[in-house]
Swiss-Prot record:
This is E3 ubiquitin-protein ligase LAP. Zn(2+) 2 binds at C19, C21, C45, C48. Residues 95-111 are lumenal. InterPro entries: Znf_RING-CH, Znf_RING/FYVE/PHD. PANTHER family: E3 UBIQUITIN-PROTEIN LIGASE MARCH 2/3 FAMILY MEMBER, FI20425P1. A zinc finger (RING-CH-type) spans 1-55. Its main location: host cell.
Length: 156
């Protein structure tokens, strides 16, 4: 009688040593185990709790798949980045004019008000810059994770 792969329930003549289990749990196709590991993202056997010998491999950046499941979040991030970049550009463009305006005013109260407004605009621009960097880094880390796969090897 032939052995049966515990993942696909097909006939299997392979006996692989991916964990500490014995007998029927060693009967598994290598391709089935690869698919199961990449799907489940489990790092250890559910039964014997032995850690799998797994290597994470990343796809080359040029070959990344940029399709994301959560399109609303991705769209929100893109629109936020565009809005922030436009705001930052306008702040930089207008900052020189605002500085000249503040220094040209003789009234102390108006000068202080303009200085406060100018400072708030600049701080907002800096905050937007930090948020843009954080969102881009998060976006790239998520893409990197989605463009990776796990390779399992037998335990020696």
């Amino acid at each position: 009688m032939s052995d049966i792969c515990w993942i696909c329930n097909d006939v299997c003549d392979e006996r692989n040593n991916f964990c500490g289990c014995n007998e029927e749990y060693k009967v598994v196709h290598i391709k089935c185990m690869q698919l199961w590991i990449n799907y489940s993202k489990k790092k250890e056997c559910n039964l014997c709790k032995t850690k799998y010998n797994i290597k994470k491999t990343y796809v080359s950046f040029k070959k990344w798949n940029w399709c994301f499941n959560d399109k609303k979040t991705t769209l929100f991030k893109i629109f936020f980045i565009l809005f922030a970049l436009v705001f930052i550009f306008l702040t930089i463009t207008l900052s020189n004019d605002m500085a000249n305006l503040v220094t040209g005013i003789n009234d102390l109260i108006c000068s202080i008000i303009f200085l406060i407004v100018y400072t708030v605009v600049m701080l907002t621009s800096i905050c937007f810059s930090v948020f843009v960097v954080a969102i881009v880094v998060d976006f790239l880390l998520e893409a990197k994770e989605k463009n990776s796969f796990l390779t399992i090897r037998e335990i020696v």
